[in-house]
Each structure stands twice: as C-alpha cells, then as structure tokens.
C-alpha cells in the first residue's frame, strides 16, 4: 500500500531547502486549504447529484436529465444561480449573529475533515486523540444553528433552531458511545492506528455482535445529527417553512445546504474508517492470493467506495421512512438508543476483557 507521507515529506524537505521553515509551513497550510476547498466543491456536486438520482430511483422517476448528459451539469447550473442571488438580511435581524451563523456551520465541517485518513499517510492531523477532536469539532455546528435561529428574529427559525439543537445534542451521545465502543475494541483513539488495526479484518466483523449493534446505532444517530430524513423535523416545510434557514438567501443559504451534504459525507467517512477498515483493503485470512489482488487497489479508492456505500445507505433511509414528530425523535434517543448504547459499550468491554473477539 502506497504511503502518501513519502510525498508530503519530500515536498516539505524541498521547501525547506529553498526557504525558512516558517514560510514552508505557511505555504503547506495554504496548499492544504486549497486542496480541502477543492475536495469540498467536488464532493458537494457529486453528493447533490447522487441524492437527486437516488431519490428519483426510489420514487420511480428519472431525476435531473435535461442539463448535460444524464443531467450531470444540473448541479453546476444551480450553484451558478445561487452565486448570483442577492444576500438579503431581514430588517429586525441581529446582523452580526445572522451573518456569523453560516460560517460557524461550515467551519465545523472543515474542522472535522482534518483527522479523517483518506489513505495511508494522507490525513491532515494524525494525533493520539483524533476521536476526541472529531467529537469536539462536530459539536460546534449546533452553535451556528442556534445563532441562525436567534439572529434571524423569526419565530419559525427560532423553533427550528431549538428543535435542531435538542436533536443534535441528544444524538451526539449515541454517536459518541458507538464510536467509543470501537475504541474499546482497538485500544486507541488515533484514526491511523484504528485503520491499521483492521489489516486482518474489519471491526464490524472482528467485534462480533457489539460491533454490528454499534454500527446500526451510529447510522441512525449520525443521520439524526445531520438533520436528514426521517429526522429532518427542524426544517419541516409543512410546519416551519424551512426551519432555521428560513430567512437566509444566496450563498448564506448555500453554506447551510453545503454543510448538510458535507456532514453527510463526514458521517459516512467516520463509519467507513472505524467499522469498515477505512483505506484498508478487504483481506480474508487464509486466502493469500485474494489478499494480494486486493492490495493492488489503491487505498483511497477503498476509502471512497466504502464512504459512498454508507452515503447510499443513509439516502436509502431518508427516502424510505416517513418524517418523525419531535417527541418521537427524542423518545427514540433517550428511551432506546442511549440505554442500548450504554449496554453495548459494557458488552464490548466484557468481550475485550475475556478475549471474545477475533
């Protein structure tokens, strides 16, 4: 498996040979930022197009098919239309909070991307508390949502923001405990070590029943954290027009829309990394020839294939189940998912303590 750290170290040494270390680090940070923005733009276009096609498939229709081959340029046209729209600020809104909220939401998505390993040696931050950093950074987004509801000075926006805040804060518990269940199995919170620990088998298979339960709970709770159906009540059109982004237009609305799909991909990426081996290829013990063939497939292809598989599962859930009421959403979390997650965490601890795992 190719190690991308060889390339990054070579670039770092080359820059150090022609300039001071401070300038070299500054240029590297700029390059990383440009790469992240480019990746974000590509992911947004692909995910929105994929959502429309998957939705059309489940509803027995074609989806976008007019602009470009198979409607492939429709998303780009929508982006250009959004860029040309006026950014309108309500007269009675708190201008500072109103304008700050979209940036808070998008910054939270940027930060969570930092510790996800796309390939061996291809992660921005690789440190021993990567799981804690991920959970902490992802919780910043709820602050932006609450600021959007309050700063808009609109009762529908405020109700949507309060619903979203209660929902996200509640489901973060299940997400955290599902991830910690797998941390107990591996014994580390560093994402690169978690992936390398799955060289001889993915955790969803090595962890037995507790790993499968944690994966299912993570998918449900992760979907709820992204405010996607059937947990999209904070922006229910029939009740709250558009929820906390009712008063937003132009690229301010675009930031919220973009953050939803980026958070969807982040949830899928974390699931692929922790449960499905990340960039690690599929290996079956005893089949050396098969394992050698799998090693020829680049790691980033494995990573994105697994991530988009999880994205498809989450889209399948959204377009299959009806929207839940707010009391049903919170009952599902506090009466079912949290107790099951706690028991599952203890069960995994017992499995590790007594060696009941592969």
Curated annotation (Swiss-Prot):
It catalyses: a quinone + NADH + 5 H(+)(in) = a quinol + NAD(+) + 4 H(+)(out). The chain crosses the membrane at residues 30-50, 96-116, 129-149, 168-188, 201-221, 265-285, 297-317, 336-356. Signal peptide: none annotated. HAMAP family: NDH1_NuoH. This is NADH-quinone oxidoreductase subunit H. Keywords: Cell inner membrane, Cell membrane, Membrane, NAD, Quinone, Translocase, Transmembrane, Transmembrane helix, Ubiquinone. Belongs to the complex I subunit 1 family. Its EC number is 7.1.1.-. It is a multi-pass membrane protein. GO terms for cellular component: plasma membrane. NDH-1 shuttles electrons from NADH, via FMN and iron-sulfur (Fe-S) centers, to quinones in the respiratory chain. The immediate electron acceptor for the enzyme in this species is believed to be ubiquinone. Couples the redox reaction to proton translocation (for every two electrons transferred, four hydrogen ions are translocated across the cytoplasmic membrane), and thus conserves the redox energy in a proton gradient. This subunit may bind ubiquinone. NDH-1 is composed of 14 different subunits. Subunits NuoA, H, J, K, L, M, N constitute the membrane sector of the complex. GO terms for molecular function: oxidoreductase activity, acting on NAD(P)H, quinone or similar compound as acceptor; quinone binding. It comes from the Bacteria. One of its GO terms (biological process) is aerobic respiration. It comes from Bacteroides thetaiotaomicron (strain ATCC 29148 / DSM 2079 / JCM 5827 / CCUG 10774 / NCTC 10582 / VPI-5482 / E50). It is found in: Cell inner membrane. The keyword Cell membrane applies. InterPro entries: NADH_UbQ_OxRdtase_su1/FPO, NADH_UbQ_OxRdtase_su1_CS. The keyword Translocase applies.
């Amino acid at each position: 498996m190719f190690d991308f750290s060889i390339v990054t170290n070579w670039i770092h040494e080359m820059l150090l040979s022609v300039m001071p270390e401070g300038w070299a680090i500054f240029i590297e940070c700029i390059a990383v930022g440009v790469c992240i923005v480019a990746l974000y733009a590509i992911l947004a276009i692909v995910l929105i197009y994929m959502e429309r096609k998957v939705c059309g498939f489940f509803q027995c229709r074609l989806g976008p098919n007019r602009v470009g081959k198979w409607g492939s340029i429709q998303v780009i046209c929508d982006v250009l239309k959004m860029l040309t729209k006026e950014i309108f600020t309500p007269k009675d809104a708190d201008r500072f909070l109103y304008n700050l909220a979209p940036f808070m939401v998008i910054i939270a998505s940027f930060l969570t991307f930092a510790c996800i390993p796309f390939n061996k040696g291809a992660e921005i931050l690789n440190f021993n508390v990567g799981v804690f950093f991920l959970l902490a950074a992802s919780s910043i987004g709820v602050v932006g949502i609450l600021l959007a509801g309050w700063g808009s000075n609109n009762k529908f926006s405020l109700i949507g923001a309060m619903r979203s805040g209660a929902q996200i804060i509640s489901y973060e518990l299940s997400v955290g405990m599902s991830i910690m269940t797998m941390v107990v199995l591996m014994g580390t919170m560093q994402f690169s070590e978690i992936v390398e620990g799955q060289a001889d088998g993915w955790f969803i298979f090595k962890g037995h029943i507790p790993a499968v339960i944690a994966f299912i709970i993570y998918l449900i709770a992760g979907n709820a954290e992204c405010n996607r159906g059937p947990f999209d009540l904070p922006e229910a059109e029939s009740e709250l027009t558009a929820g906390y982004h009712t008063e937003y237009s132009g690229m301010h609305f675009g930031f919220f829309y973009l953050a939803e799909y980026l958070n969807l991909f982040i949830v899928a990426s974390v699931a692929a990394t922790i449960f499905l081996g990340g960039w690690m290829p599929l290996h079956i013990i005893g089949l050396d020839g098969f394992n050698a063939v799998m090693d020829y497939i680049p790691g980033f292809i494995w990573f994105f294939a697994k991530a988009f598989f999880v994205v498809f599962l989450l889209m399948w859930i959204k377009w299959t189940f009806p929207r839940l009421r707010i009391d049903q959403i919170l009952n599902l979390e506090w009466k079912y998912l949290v107790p099951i997650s706690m028991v599952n965490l203890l069960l995994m601890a017992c499995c590790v303590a007594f060696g009941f795992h592969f």
